[in-house]
């Protein structure tokens, strides 16, 4: 084996302390908190691996480490140079640096991962998901090196990882299929021809793809050409394999998948379905298990077809068979993911089976501990993918930055947080911007959903833009609450894009009352401080006077906010209870009215409400209410009089410039100074978090300047191209 430059860091006495005192048969969640759900328990007399290496990063690496630690297995983490202080590195017993920040120079370097296995003496490798998890050559090389691949055998990965070949196998296994072209698409012209033959719309996707990358929907020839080119580039970047296929796009389906678990003794189980229809850019946003759309008989048929396919390829690990389901409950095979799925926690919640634990057991050679008849379906679970993304831009353009404040809502009943970050962690342009998989479990769908609302309201994230506003709005939205969802849910519910939560008049009063009460309390405290050397009666007087403000709350972007005359009077001199008069209405507010607290639990007219203060400056408080930040102006009456003399800033015409919508790297520049371009023409292609983004001209005109070159790294808001 070729030697690769690597550095090994051993962490003494970490990881085994928990397992040393663990009792056989005790569920993992008693020792590891609420991160892991299993009722199967652990047999500590059963042979197992001594040490495994996790060929991944972030939350999935942490997730695998938790189960391995509970089983008494030592762990080795790998990392890039920018990940040296990451949480998964700190959690592991040993860590090996495998290269530079770009994935192609580190996490996708199979040779360096193999060298790390040899250097550390790891007996097996868990690949997580993404990266090398579905790389047949890597799995085969591991086998040659005498190490186990904690996943399916390399032949099964090859058969199912190639989307073209997998469709042929699925057809032979009598799995319901989507119409399409079985061969590889050679170029843009062929893509257009095949698309016409199938009939638009079509789905253009990478043969080796997954996770929503390398996929585009095309409704015409132009989109087919652009979709082929962008998806091919994306596939090469993400998977090192740019082969493409085309199939009929089923408009407005549900995306429902079946978890399978198989061993090396011919046993195969289906662990119930997951509903994954809420998506943007073909990536899942919120998942649930089970699906409210799937009756028991349909569940059985989907499960049996999934197992048929798994057995047809000799599958021997955890995997997921994905289906598209139409409105008549007809289901069609989409693909099989030969790895641990991102959303596996919700299946663990409803079955009590730790899928990672069983992957470790099966890879070692043990049979599955239960039969199909013993697979339970207990309650309901949801997973919200919390991303460092701006939900107001295309339902989520990636964001970067450092987490200046970070508190997970683990105190909420039924909550599980699978994350790979902590306060102070950096979200960079090199990797997926996932912050956490927020999971809730309840006795039924309504309880699990209510717990998700509470968890999102209590989730504290500062320093990066995140998608909690969108997640929180979805979980309270009527269609979602009733289970009326398809893959078109987001564009149908938010046709103009996500604009934030819309507040009713009553909810507007809540936000104004809260902000005004906070401001009044701040002034009362200031008066106490200024008068601290005077008689005590002046201290009480600070909370006995009436504070008058003019408050305003913009309900929609661009609209001039309505101003309200507000009076705040603290009840019985209490700092935590006040009556707020807004025009002719009176609101009673009590509870945590402290500006310094990240989360405020209050009661408004007897109703419990959770809010957060995410920004404050003179005359303005930004209140996070139902996930959406609202900037509330709270000004003394005199100050408002002077505002009329302040000129409003003129709006800038941005149609003459192309701005970077996010931090990223420039992949293509398609114009030069002097070129004539038409409105909507593609000018620049940039990549961020392994996703390709095409940037277009906002108007017809001549190119005045091109400020970037291919390979350049740019920040959000940089001017890339200028038009005359």
UniProtKB/Swiss-Prot annotation:
Modified sites of kind N6-biotinyllysine: 690
GO cellular component terms listed in the entry, alphabetical order: mitochondrial matrix; mitochondrion
PROSITE patterns assigned to the protein according to its UniProt record, in alphabetical order: ATP_GRASP (PS50975), BC (PS50979), BIOTIN (PS00188), BIOTINYL_LIPOYL (PS50968), CPSASE_1 (PS00866), CPSASE_2 (PS00867)
Residues noted as binding Mg(2+) 2 in the record, renumbered to the chain: 335, 337
Cofactors that this protein relies on: biotin; Mg(2+); Mn(2+)
List of residues binding Mg(2+) 1: 322, 335
Keyword Lipid biosynthesis (UniProt): no
Native source species: Caenorhabditis elegans
Positions bound to ATP: 163, 195-256, 282
EC number annotated for this UniProt entry: 6.4.1.3
An example Gene Ontology biological process: lipid catabolic process
NCBIfam families: PRK08591.1
Active site: 339
Residues that hold biotin according to the record: 395
Catalysed reactions, semicolon-separated: propanoyl-CoA + hydrogencarbonate + ATP = (S)-methylmalonyl-CoA + ADP + phosphate + H(+); butanoyl-CoA + hydrogencarbonate + ATP = (2S)-ethylmalonyl-CoA + ADP + phosphate + H(+)
Pfam family, one: Biotin_carb_C
Function statement: This is one of the 2 subunits of the biotin-dependent propionyl-CoA carboxylase (PCC), a mitochondrial enzyme involved in the catabolism of odd chain fatty acids, branched-chain amino acids isoleucine, threonine, methionine, and valine and other metabolites. Propionyl-CoA carboxylase catalyzes the carboxylation of propionyl-CoA/propanoyl-CoA to D-methylmalonyl-CoA/(S)-methylmalonyl-CoA.
Location within or outside the cell: Mitochondrion matrix
Binding site for Mn(2+) 1: 322, 335
Domain observations: Consists of an N-terminal biotin carboxylation/carboxylase (BC) domain that catalyzes the transient carboxylation of the biotin covalently attached to the C-terminal biotinyl-binding/biotin carboxyl carrier (BCC) domain.
Annotated Mn(2+) 2 binding sites: 335, 337
Protein's name according to its UniProt entry: Propionyl-CoA carboxylase alpha chain, mitochondrial
Annotated keywords: ATP-binding, Biotin, Ligase, Lipid degradation, Lipid metabolism, Magnesium, Manganese, Metal-binding, Mitochondrion, Nucleotide-binding, Transit peptide
């Amino acid at each position: 084996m070729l030697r690769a430059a690597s550095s090994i860091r051993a962490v003494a006495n970490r990881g085994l302390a928990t397992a040393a005192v663990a009792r056989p048969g005790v569920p993992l969640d008693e020792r590891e908190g609420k991160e892991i759900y299993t009722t199967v328990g652990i047999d500590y007399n059963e042979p197992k691996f001594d040490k495994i290496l996790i060929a991944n990063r972030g939350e999935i690496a942490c997730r695998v480490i938790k189960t391995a630690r509970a089983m008494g297995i030592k762990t080795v983490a790998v990392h890039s140079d920018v990940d040296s202080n990451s949480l998964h590195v700190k959690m592991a017993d040993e860590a090996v640096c495998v290269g530079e920040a770009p994935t192609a120079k580190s996490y996708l370097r199979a040779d360096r991962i193999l060298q790390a296995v040899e250097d550390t003496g790891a007996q097996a490798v868990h690949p997580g998901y993404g990266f090398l998890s579905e790389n047949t050559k890597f799995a085969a090389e591991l086998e040659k090196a005498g190490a186990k691949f904690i996943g399916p055998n390399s032949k099964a990965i090859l058969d199912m990882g190639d989307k073209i070949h997998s469709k042929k196998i699925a057809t032979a296994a009598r799995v319901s299929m989507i119409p399409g072209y079985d061969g590889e698409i050679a170029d843009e012209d062929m893509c257009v021809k095949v698309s016409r033959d199938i009939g638009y719309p079509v789905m253009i996707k990478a043969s080796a793809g997954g996770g929503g990358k390398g996929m585009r929907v095309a409704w015409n020839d132009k989109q087919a050409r652009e979709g082929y080119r962008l998806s091919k580039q994306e596939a090469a970047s993400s998977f090192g394999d740019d082969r493409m296929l085309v199939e009929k796009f089923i408009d407005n389906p549900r995306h429902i998948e079946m978890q399978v678990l198989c061993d090396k003794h011919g046993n195969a189980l289906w662990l119930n379905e997951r509903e994954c229809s809420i998506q943007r850019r073909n990536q899942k946003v919120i998942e649930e298990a089970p699906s409210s759309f799937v009756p028991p008989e349909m569940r059985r048929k989907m499960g049996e077809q999934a197992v048929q396919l798994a057995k047809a390829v000799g599958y021997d690990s955890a995997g997921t068979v994905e289906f598209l389901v139409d409105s008549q409950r007809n289901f069609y095979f989409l693909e099989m993911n030969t790895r641990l799925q991102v959303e596996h926690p919700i299946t663990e919640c409803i079955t009590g089976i730790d899928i990672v634990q069983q992957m470790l057991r099966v890879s070692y050679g043990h049979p599955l501990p239960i039969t199909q008849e013993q697979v339970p379906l207990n309650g309901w679970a949801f997973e919200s993918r919390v991303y460092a993304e701006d939900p107001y831009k295309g339902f989520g353009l990636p964001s970067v930055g450092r987490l200046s404040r970070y508190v997970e809502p683990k105190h909420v009943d039924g909550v599980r947080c699978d994350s790979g970050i902590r306060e102070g962690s950096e979200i960079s342009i090199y990797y997926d911007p996932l912050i956490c998989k927020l999971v809730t479990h309840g006795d039924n769908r309504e309880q699990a959903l209510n717990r998700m609302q509470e968890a999102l309201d209590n989730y504290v994230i500062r320093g990066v833009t995140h998608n909690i506003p969108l997640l929180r709005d979805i979980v309270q939205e009527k269609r979602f609450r009733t289970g009326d969802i398809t893959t078109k849910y987001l564009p149908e519910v938010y046709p103009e894009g996500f604009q934030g939560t819309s507040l009713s008049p009553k909810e507007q009063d809540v936000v104004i009352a809260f902000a005004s009460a906070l401001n009044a309390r701040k002034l009362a405290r200031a008066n106490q401080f200024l008068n601290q050397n005077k008689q005590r009666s002046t201290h009480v007087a600070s909370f006995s006077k009436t504070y008058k403000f003019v408050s305003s709350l913009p309900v929609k972007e661009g609209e001039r906010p309505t101003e309200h005359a507000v009076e705040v009077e603290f009840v019985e001199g209490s700092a935590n209870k006040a009556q707020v008069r807004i025009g002719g209405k009176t609101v009673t507010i009590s509870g945590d009215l402290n500006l310094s607290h990240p989360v405020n639990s209050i009661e408004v007219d007897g109703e419990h409400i959770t809010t957060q203060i995410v920004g404050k400056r003179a005359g303005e408080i930004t209140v996070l209410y139902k996930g959406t930040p609202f900037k509330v102006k709270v000004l003394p009456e005199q100050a408002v009089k002077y505002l009329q003399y302040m000129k409003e800033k003129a709006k800038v015409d941005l149609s003459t410039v192309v701005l970077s919508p996010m931090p990223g790297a420039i992949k293509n520049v398609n114009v030069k100074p002097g070129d004539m371009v038409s409105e909507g023409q593609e000018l620049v292609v940039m990549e961020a978090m392994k996703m390709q983004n095409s940037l277009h001209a906002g108007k017809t005109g001549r190119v005045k300047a091109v400020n970037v070159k291919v390979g350049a790294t740019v920040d959000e808001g940089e001017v890339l191209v200028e038009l005359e």
